[in-house]
Amino acid sequence: MRVLVRRCWGPPLAHGARRGRPSPQWRALARLGWEDCRDSRVREKPPWRVLFFGTDQFAREALRALHAARENKEEELIDKLEVVTMPSPSPKGLPVKQYAVQSQLPVYEWPDVGSGEYDVGVVASFGRLLNEALILKFPYGILNVHPSCLPRWRGPAPVIHTVLHGDTVTGVTIMQIRPKRFDVGPILKQETVPVPPKSTAKELEAVLSRLGANMLISVLKNLPESLSNGRQQPMEGATYAPKISAGTSCIKWEEQTSEQIFRLYRAIGNIIPLQTLWMANTIKLLDLVEVNSSVLADPKLTGQALIPGSVIYHKQSQILLVYCKDGWIGVRSVMLKKSLTATDFYNGYLHPWYQKNSQAQPSQCRFQTLRLPTKKKQKKTVAMQQCIE
């Protein structure tokens, strides 16, 4: 009885914790004894039959580890491995599909999950809630490889928010999937690692993907025991990591400090370039650099009153200096119609403007916060344009 309940519904709740009411399917399974439910096809030990759900590079590393385990005939951990991924507009597909095809693994595109029999499911960066009916097809449930120390940073973008908020410690959690909510199931294994100083989200994700892959294999080696020893997530300390929108990339010069801007750059710069507004033109800031003390000592920076967004070209270091809430950031290249170095932007745009406005102050030629329309406004604008046409 106890073994079945833990397999289907997880370990007991901590004292005082609350949980949503189980569905009739879960309650029915809990009322049955293990001997009554045991199927001759359910395996008590490895090798396991695994169905993997994933999409991106983080998930690809977990799939690679599972595939390597299947190929290792001496260890006999996995003898069947199939893959479910999301459709992609790219002909090659997402990284997980590319790896599956290259490795000649059976691959399905969601919502198709095949019709085979499996012992356990594994999810990594899949981005879809899996319903109860699907979860119940797996005797050992579905495991999730999540790149944070749950309950901190539940949701689809934990690594980005780790960097964005300046966390100094993060980690990976192997947990059991629960229906209807993301990242709330019992923790089977959790390990922490320090966040390297000035690490980008992409760099940190690579570190966590390798850690998560190793942890997943460790859990699968002792799967029944890991499930029995799972612990509920604590009630306190839960935070959510929502998807990043284009609006997040718009720098708020009056509100954000240089540290916050650099965190934003390291968190999303490789996905969405940071954006600003200059003379009614949208400019993307491609390469940000910290400003050293010798540059900050320049009289041009200290001898005049400046407001956030003021932009000055520093000839010696060949960077644009932009003033924010508490100081300066450096920009080596921008995108304005095409990619431009700081020198190109100065020669083609800033310098001609100052020639026409010789008495102007830097504050009159400044970067301003770009205000992107909300999705509702965008849809309304498109609808109006269609009516006009």
UniProtKB/Swiss-Prot annotation:
GO biological process, one term: conversion of methionyl-tRNA to N-formyl-methionyl-tRNA
EC number: 2.1.2.9
Effect of residue 125 to L: In COXPD15; loss of methionyl-tRNA formyltransferase activity
UniProt KW Phosphoprotein keyword: no
Enzymatic class: transferase
Family: Belongs to the Fmt family.
Stated name of the protein: Methionyl-tRNA formyltransferase, mitochondrial
Organism the protein comes from: Homo sapiens (Human)
Lineage, opening ranks: Eukaryota, Metazoa, Chordata, Craniata, Vertebrata
The gene coding this protein: MTFMT
